[in-house]
């Protein structure tokens, strides 16, 4: 038995390693080198152009960004390499329904730009936990949410992107997995540590263009190869692997036959893999957390020149979010047509032979298209696309995570830290994240058998709804208080962890081997669980809040929707804490700073510490709370919202 397994594994290794020969040519390597040169050049330009020597400059780009790089960065930060692998893989397995996770985001982007960002800007905050501290007071909400956000970054974004990026690295370059990941993370960290948010956004913009151009070219090649859209819809329904029996297993035909509703977004509420009530009501809840509360996304909006630029960026990203169906999901489905025996394999021994994984090879759908369908030169372009999506997503996570650590956690440890110390701490924390990311790789490799999209969305459904509930109530119900918010989060955390730990312990199962997790815990689809969890948390928040003392309005001006336009002075709930730990006491180090040598000055220039000051400039302070718009541009934004909603309505009407 052991010898058989080793033979199968070696066969898979040789089969996969042979694909790396496809990219060992001057044309592909030249394209990849050019990609790295261009991205590094843009990163260096952004480092030199922008102010990185203040907290506002490093973490919020001095609130000087225009709409188009912001919109491109929102898209690039969201679309990691996990999307190319995960969306294409799930599309190959079950059809277009998975695109709902992407296309429904347009509505939440509008909610972000028109409702949440104005509140965040008027609150004058840099991080989402900081908003909760201003809104509710106390420290426990801010600290808890910061730690939870960092935990989610590691188990969701970083793990999914590194895993999916590793698939391309292994297939295309034949490099040692850990060496390749170390190189990528090192380059990614250089942008984040030295350049700040402005550098991240500008490199994101370049990488978004590369992603869109490359994935569009691959889509065209894929549709030409399959014979057009009509031929594609017909052939997909007949894409059944040649080997459907073996390993002494009785395999149900539904495990390898394309689903009858493969070309519909809305599916059966009971038997559907993505049930339509979950699509309609569960996805908006997880999307509310991701698009309106997630530090990675909101931080990009907080750096806009004004609110009109923020709204325009959200609209641009909304249009771009309609593209994954055509650029990722459908190419994954075409890969099943072209490479049916590998992508749609169902017999475990056959899957091991093709890709080394016994539960399926759908995650290899997109990489197979890139390496087998694209000609020389374009293969290098597509690998650059994968590197771009991986690096843009990771730079975004690293920058936002360092912001959370510095603003919400480090200042609690070092209450009198100088501005220079805060900047250095934020940069060093990125290094800690890199080490954590590398240590997480073996865990990701062990869990690589399932469909990546369902893994990420399930985790979001277990941890995201309590956060969404707290922020929604915080903005729209001024009666909510700190006790209600805290206990709502605690109840939600316990419920979410019970479900998540149970699934990790028993496994999520597959078509061949259903999970043995008790039905009372795991019997409800994760999107339905998100709905239940969300409303339970809201009930707890409101119930506890109405049973305890309310927060006086003097502490809530411009922190909630009802008082968003209030002109009265706000007394922050943490005002006493601020006085106790005032800036004057923590600046003695900077005031008595000794002259620095040439080497230290060069290092400071590289890291943006050469003009370190302990306060934001007056312009930055005013910009942080300014939400004024010119009437003309406000009207232009509102008209574009109507156009986007019309396009989205047609999209859902056609594919639902």
UniProtKB/Swiss-Prot annotation:
Extracellular side: 48-64, 127-171, 230-270, 335-423, 477-526
A Pfam cross-reference name: SSF
GO BP annotations, alphabetical order: proton transmembrane transport
Domain of life: Eukaryota
Tissue-level expression: Expressed in small intestine. Expressed in kidney.
Transmembrane segment boundaries: 29-47, 65-85, 106-126, 172-191, 209-229, 271-291, 315-334, 424-443, 456-476, 527-547, 635-655
PANTHER family: GLUCOSE SENSOR PROTEIN SLC5A4-RELATED, SOLUTE CARRIER FAMILY 5
Function field: Does not function as sodium/D-glucose symporter. Generates D-glucose-induced depolarization in a pH-dependent manner, with activity in acidic conditions (pH 5) but not neutral conditions.
Family under the similarity heading: Belongs to the sodium:solute symporter (SSF) (TC 2.A.21) family.
Protein name in UniProt: Solute carrier family 5 member 4A
Source organism (scientific name): Mus musculus
Lineage: Eukaryota, Metazoa, Chordata, Craniata, Vertebrata
């Amino acid at each position: 038995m052991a010898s058989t397994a080793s033979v199968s594994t070696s066969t898979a290794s040789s089969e996969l390693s042979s694909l790396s020969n496809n990219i060992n040519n001057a044309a592909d390597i030249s394209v990849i080198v050019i990609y790295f040169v261009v991205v590094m050049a843009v990163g260096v330009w952004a480092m030199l152009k922008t102010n990185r020597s203040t907290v506002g400059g490093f973490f919020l780009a001095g609130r000087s960004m225009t709409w188009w790089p912001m919109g491109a960065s929102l898209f690039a930060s969201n679309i990691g390499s996990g999307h190319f692998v995960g969306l294409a893989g799930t599309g190959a397995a079950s059809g277009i329904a998975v695109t709902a996770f992407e296309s429904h985001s347009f509505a939440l982007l509008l909610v972000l730009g028109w409702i949440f960002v104005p509140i965040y800007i008027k609150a004058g905050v840099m991080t989402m936990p900081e908003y909760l501290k201003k809104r509710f007071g106390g420290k426990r909400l801010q600290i808890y949410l910061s730690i939870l956000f960092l935990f989610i970054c590691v188990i969701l974004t970083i793990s999914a992107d590194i895993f999916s990026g590793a698939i391309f690295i292994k297939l295309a370059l034949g490099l040692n997995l850990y060496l390749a990941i170390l190189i990528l993370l090192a380059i990614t960290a250089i942008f984040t540590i030295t350049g700040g948010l402005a550098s991240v956004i500008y490199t994101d913009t370049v990488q978004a263009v590369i992603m869109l151009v490359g994935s569009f070219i691959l889509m065209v090649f894929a549709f030409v190869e399959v014979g057009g859209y009509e031929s594609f819809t017909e052939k997909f329904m007949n894409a059944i692997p040649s080997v459907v029996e073996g390993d002494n297993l009785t395999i149900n035909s539904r495990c390898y036959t394309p689903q009858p509703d493969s070309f519909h977004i809305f599916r059966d509420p009971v038997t559907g893999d993505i049930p339509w009530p979950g699509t309609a009501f569960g996805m908006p809840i997880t999307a509310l957390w991701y698009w309106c509360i997630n530090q990675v996304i909101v931080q990009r909006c907080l750096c806009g020149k004004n609110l009109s630029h923020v709204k325009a960026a959200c609209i641009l990203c909304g249009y771009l979010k309609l593209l994954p169906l055509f650029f990722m999901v459908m190419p994954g489905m075409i890969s099943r047509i072209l490479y049916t025996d590998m992508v749609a394999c169902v017999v475990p021994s056959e899957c091991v032979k093709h890709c080394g994984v016994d539960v399926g090879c759908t995650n290899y759908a997109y990489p197979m298209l890139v390496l087998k369908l694209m000609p020389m030169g374009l293969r290098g372009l597509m690998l650059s696309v994968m590197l771009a999506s991986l690096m843009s997503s990771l730079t975004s996570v690293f920058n936002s995570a360092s912001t959370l650590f510095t603003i919400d956690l480090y200042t609690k440890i070092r209450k009198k830290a100088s501005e220079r110390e805060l900047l250095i701490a934020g940069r060093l924390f990125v290094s800690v994240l890199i080490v954590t990311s590398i240590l997480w790789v073996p865990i990701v490799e062990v869990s690589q058998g399932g469909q990546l999209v369902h893994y990420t969305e399930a985790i979001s459904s277990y941890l995201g709804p309590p956060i969404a509930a707290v922020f929604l109530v915080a903005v729209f119900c001024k009666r909510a208080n700190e006790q209600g918010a805290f206990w709502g989060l605690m109840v939600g955390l316990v419920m979410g962890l019970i479900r998540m730990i149970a699934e990790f312990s028993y496994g999520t199962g597959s078509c061949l081997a259903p999970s043995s997790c008790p039905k009372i815990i795991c019997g409800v689809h994760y999107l339905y669980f998100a709905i239940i969890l969300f409303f339970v948390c809201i009930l707890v928040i409101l119930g506890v809040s109405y049973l305890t003392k309310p927060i006086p309005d003097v502490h809530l001006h411009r922190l909630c929707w009802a008082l968003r336009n209030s002109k009265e002075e706000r007394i922050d709930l943490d005002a006493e804490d601020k006085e106790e730990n005032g800036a004057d006491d923590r600046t003695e180090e900077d005031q008595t700073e000794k002259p620095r040598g040439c080497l230290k000055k060069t290092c400071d220039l590289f890291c943006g510490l050469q003009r370190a000051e302990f306060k934001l400039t007056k312009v930055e302070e005013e910009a942080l709370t300014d939400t004024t718009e010119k009437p003309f541009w406000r009207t232009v934004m509102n008209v574009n919202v109507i156009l986007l909603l019309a396009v989205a309505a047609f999209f859902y009407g056609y594919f639902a």
